[in-house]
Amino acid sequence: MGWKTVMKQQKLIEKMTIEEKAAILSGKTVWQTREIDRLSIPSIFLSDGPHGIRKQAGAGDHLGLNASLNATCFPTAATIANSWNQDLGEEIGQALGEEAVSMDVNILLGPGLNIKRSPLCGRNFEYFSEDPYLSGKMAASYIRGIQSKGVYACPKHLAVNSQELRRMAMDAVVDERTLREIYLTGFEIAVKEGHAKAIMSSYNQINGIYANEDKHLLTDILRKEWGFDGIVVTDWGGSNDHVKGVAAGSNLEMPSCGYDSAREVIAAVRNGKLKEADLDERVGELVDAVMELTSGKKLSDKNFDRNAHHQLARKAAAESMVLLKNEKQILPLDTKKSIAIIGDFAFSPRYQGAGSSMVNPTKVEDMSSILQQYDLNILGMTRGYQRNGDVDENDRKFALNLSMNADIVIFCFGLDEISESEGLDRTHMRIPQNQIDLLQDISKVNENIIGILSAGSAIEMPWHTCCKAILHGYLNGQAGASATLDILTGKVNPSGRLAETYPISYEQTPAFRYYPSNEKTSEYRESVYVGYRYYDTSKVRVQYPFGFGLSYTEFTYSDLIIEEDGIKVSVTNTGDRDGAEVVQMYVGLPNAIVFRPEKELKGFAKVYLKAGESRQLRIPFDDKTFRYWNIKTGQWEIETGTYQIMVGASVADIRLTGMTERTGNSKGYPYNPAKMPYYYTGIVQKISDEEFRELLGHDIPNGRWSGNLEINDAICQMYYAKSRLARLIYRCLTKMKKKSEAQGKPDLNILFIYNMPFRGIAKMTGGAVSMEMVYGIVDAVNGHFMLGVKKIIGGYFRNRRNNKKYEKLLKGAGGKCR
């Protein structure tokens, strides 16, 4: 098998008919694979669950329109990344694995580790960081925990999936170096260190090739370079050409699309477009996984320890919150002072994002219900503002009066549900204005405001001067309220550090002019300068830098020792409280020949120290510490030079610096600095076509739509349709989308359809619609109504006949593939 060992189930594969082989590579239902009864190959169950299991009790659907079983809602990945604690990630992973086992889930679809290219990505709350090294390390910890319970983790979405707009119909135009260093490194760590047994391919194209059909990605890189020995699963409805996917290295098309894809696979084998050896290899990899996941498995324990998992969620939330500001040490709270609590989020917490990751929690805390458990002098509490933007003048006046009479105001605010969701990117970085208006009015009557933020991604903070303290809870799960009060009262010393940069304004961000995309392409002109790599290199002042976070104590650094294989550094807690520090190691190469960021995170350690305690830490170098991807030679290389090793409390707070000499192995440098001046300065907001073309090494693809709509164009592009009916459908969809936005809650079904390509109609309807029928729909949309209707009607009856015929072939094999 080339880079692989012989399949464990080789004899079983040899007994399968070609119809069974083709059928098993597509799902049976929305969440299950097909079983083959005559060969005792069982079905397995896949479920969403990056921060909690979302297994539906009734008929399954991709977006959770039907209720799911109760599960622990842990803080989202964006929150846990702020803990910088791999042990915590593994502990959460173990709990997720336990709950998956209790619900008979075999593969858990998570964690998500796409890079936060822009703060506007609607799904950033599901992703760890703007930094690939931190993302990969945290993902690997989750994966180890999940898989320790006999469940496969399925990190997603491979790769370059950094936007929701037209995500199923978008082509990411990115150079190979940026692809490798920024967008693949996290997955590489997840595979090599987490030993992930499944990977989900992304919806989008990468340089003109769908991720699920990209042999360079799925075979050359994933399997051969990284040693991946698991299965590749499509995102739901993310299969474009199933035959090409199988040839490239994809094992499982989800969800069920009937037998349409299976027929395509058989035809491709018979006409020579697909090698039967490739088909056998994909089937072998999948059957190996199925048998490993089900062999010797006992009946699951349906009763996981709900209370223990709730307490873990509380611990995780407390360790992941970031104290951004604490003037005059207003925190921890003085229990003698009177406190007013204002804000809708204190009554109805926003603890998770919207979309396929939405969990039905075992219980949810809110601040208003648990205050009696804490020794606080609460003067009163009220909402003060409406979540949907409406104004209740009486409640507003009451909030101001309450604030005027209190010693301290705790103001709970943040992004509402419509601001962050799968299927919908943000259009700005601002918190709803009605919340800020109230905050500013309160600041005029009380200067002692403690802001409690809830948001899954970076926001603009022009109002930060209104607050004496700011505690950012992100989306902190079902136990977030008690975790917040634990920090406010000093029961827990905050130790979260930002896993992403907070710019002053969206216009500062590196991809500001390129995000989200043209009509067909998204151009990654900023190259490797993502997040702090851009701000730090181009000297852009930010609100809060990557890695930043305050504590109730102080830490000093000393005695940096640089060795051949790592560093040693001493850290001392010089305050009067026990606490934890996140020690961050950055590496840079001054006067580099190859352009690169000024510094990059290459190691970190979280250390817990008692008051007055000192400890020496060791942070090792690894194979990623000094490397860069040489596009000229097509390999990882090290540039010869004197590297700067910087150790600090954030990317902007470097405490100790040293140097180390490294002899490189470069076999020719890839760039001409004269042709790429802005890449060498890091000022990448206005990259010209000429410079981007030089970076890519080829012409820039045309990103504009032209001509008739095709099966891979998004349904939201029907504003170009020649059919009046199609344009009417587009207007209706747009109206329904805007209505849900105005109500403050995203309609996930509408959002999914809106951004779905026409081919998705066949991929998401369980076999009721064939690709032939989709071509008829597209003909009708393009103005050929009668031709389209003829194809739709004829295709419908042919699809029914062919499905029945396929079922008979499977039964004729002596059993059933269901």
Ranges and model annotations:
Residues 651-652, 658-729:
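Charged, amphipathic alpha-helical linkers/stalks
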Residues 694-818:
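Long, low-hydrophobicity ectodomains and other hydrophilic envelope-associated domains
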